[in-house]
Amino acid sequence: MKEPQMMEITTLVEAHSAGARMTAVVIEYSDAVLGEKLRMEDFQVEGYPIVAACASDTPRGTVARTGRFVQLILDEQNPATRLCQMGEDRRLQINRPTLMVTQKRPIEMASGKQAAPFEQQASEHMDAGVIDRFLTASFTTKTGQTLRYNLYTPEKIVRGQKYPVVLFIHDLGSCSEDVQAPLLQGTGATVWALESDYGRRPCFVLAPQYTRQCANDDFEVTWEADATVELLENLCDLYAIDRKRIYATGQSMGCMMICEMMLRNPNFFAASLLVAGQWDPARMAKAKNETLWVVVSGGDEKAFPIMRKALYGMRAAGGSLCEAHVNARADAAMLDALIRTQNNRNCNLNFTWFEGRSVIPDGLEVHGGMHHICTWKKAYDIKALREWLFEQRLYEGRISVHD
């Protein structure tokens, strides 16, 4: 009978509001490990402190008494666990390191045997969970321009049924040559896919990747804005997508691009969740009948005053506007309750801002951009906002309505 041995090593990655991070290293053995005998001191991941070790039945399974997988939980406070780093050219760099793992002492198996120690074995695989469920592809427009994108499809598609699609557009700081950057920079794309995976609100999720700035403070956009709408139209023809439930959301530059797409393509989006961005108040009045929820920080020196002016202009033109401010540090239940209260007023335009510096975590130095950047780290965590988006749908003659 063969002696127990190590089979392979995998690094686990989780999406996070502040950027994807490596959370654990998983060692697969040929035989079941005895969990109660495991000690984190028996292992080493070079350069990455371990805070716990446990056995499980699957790579991402819960703690088990015995299991063929040993999860080495990494210290989340270690900056090296973060995959996203800002490069010298102010472009997002994605780091996918190969971790080196050592088992210092023999490991007790459930059979009574031992797995021999090993030194400096490489983690050859990276399991990024829901991020890996996105396919990566490219689209060529009618004018010959190429746009790369990530697309999540519902795990179970019922024949004859159509599903909503969520378009997520990233910020300027996430511009990168790495097509997966929109999925790794935060949760603006992955949160919808994760809920779909759990069977809640199944949907498609589209996350294009832009390599350069596509919208500026002069309210100008590049060809990528029209190309993204063309891509959406193409996907609607290829997949079981409900054209009455095309949703858009974006942060900073992404918010700005969606505003322009909305102006150029009225009645295209059923609703838009716009985070930490602003657009031309002189033109936004034309979108008075669109369905929007705008979330900014009260300390955001651009997004707060400019988008408020735009929304007031939309109200003056005939739109129905509801406003509220919330403390970003309130617990999840309170934030959901506040958003639902605002939603109950049945406005097609909603404006919510985070009070004071509440969006900025303690311990972080406050500078001009912190209110801005921290907004989307919080906004996509609010379940009631995600629920609101999926309640909307188009009907003949426009304004989107609740299901």
At which residue positions do the language-model features occur?
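A domain-start/cap signature at the N-terminus of enzymes
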Residues: 1-28, 33, 47-163, 398-403
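Solvent-exposed loop/turn segments at secondary-structure junctions
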Residues: 79, 171-175, 210-215, 252-256, ...
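Short, solvent-exposed loop/turn and secondary-structure capping segments
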Residues: 83-85, 161-163, 176-182, 216-221, ...
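Gly/Ser-rich "nucleophile elbow"/oxyanion-hole loop immediately N-terminal to the catalytic nucleophile
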Residues: 157-161, 215-252
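Active-site machinery of serine-nucleophile hydrolases
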Residues: 163-165, 172-229
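Primarily recognizes the serine-hydrolase "nucleophile elbow" in alpha/beta-hydrolase
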Residues: 237-238, 243-288
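Short beta-strand/loop motif that positions the catalytic acidic residue
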Residues: 293-296
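C-terminal catalytic histidine-bearing segment of alpha/beta-hydrolase fold enzymes
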Residues: 298-304, 320-403
